[in-house]
Amino acid sequence: MTTASTSQVRQNYHQDSEAAINRQINLELYASYVYLSMSYYFDRDDVALKNFAKYFLHQSHEEREHAEKLMKLQNQRGGRIFLQDIKKPDCDDWESGLNAMECALHLEKNVNQSLLELHKLATDKNDPHLCDFIETHYLNEQVKAIKELGDHVTNLRKMGAPESGLAEYLFDKHTLGDSDNES
């Protein structure tokens, strides 16, 4: 049986940064869990918006990959991973595509704020490696995700969602369906 030992690779890696990385891992896994819930809500037979389901499933996988990237960083820097319980999503019935997109936008802004705070901590602790990692792998991607979700919310509202079921059907078919061709 081995006990947790101090790392031989740890250098210029503050305990506060290590703890903040563990919190960010939990937040990324929570976001993945929320998106997974959204995906399977839209996959239900009484909702049947398959491209919303695909879109949110893709987002779930992205968030899980973000968590895994942070876990890899934690090990590379000589930190220790301490996983916490993942909070359940705030709701099970996402009501509409518009509501889900609004919730996703709020979630991404929270994730982004947490990353900005992590970057500030890394700056305060004089950790250029962590700053570079966050800038390279997260910040620009977050801004793009927030913009995309904001655009989706705007377009759904312009189309008359959620009052118009046809709006969400057309958005599912023509906007989210077309995104398959861009990937």
Curated annotation (Swiss-Prot):
Residues 11-160 form the Ferritin-like diiron domain. Pfam families: Ferritin. One of its GO terms (biological process) is negative regulation of cell population proliferation. Changing residue 23 to A: Abrogates interaction with NCOA4. Fails to localize to punctate lysosomal structures. Its main location: cytoplasm. Its EC number is 1.16.3.1. It catalyses: 4 Fe(2+) + O2 + 4 H(+) = 4 Fe(3+) + 2 H2O. CDD domains: Euk_Ferritin. InterPro entries: Ferritin, Ferritin-like, Ferritin-like_diiron, Ferritin-like_SF, Ferritin_CS, Ferritin_DPS_dom. Expressed in the liver. Fe cation 2 binds at residues 63, 108, 142. GO terms for cellular component: autolysosome; autophagosome; cytoplasm; cytosol; extracellular exosome; extracellular region; ferritin complex; ficolin-1-rich granule lumen. The modification N-acetylmethionine is found at residue 1. Belongs to the ferritin family. PANTHER family: FERRITIN, FERRITIN HEAVY CHAIN. It is linked to Hemochromatosis 5: A disorder of iron metabolism characterized by iron overload. Excess iron is deposited in a variety of organs leading to their failure, and resulting in serious illnesses including cirrhosis, hepatomas, diabetes, cardiomyopathy, arthritis, and hypogonadotropic hypogonadism. Severe effects of the disease usually do not appear until after decades of progressive iron loading. Stores iron in a soluble, non-toxic, readily available form. Important for iron homeostasis. Has ferroxidase activity. Iron is taken up in the ferrous form and deposited as ferric hydroxides after oxidation. Also plays a role in delivery of iron to cells. Mediates iron uptake in capsule cells of the developing kidney. Delivery to lysosomes is mediated by the cargo receptor NCOA4 for autophagic degradation and release of iron. This is Ferritin heavy chain. It comes from Homo sapiens (Human). The gene is FTH1.
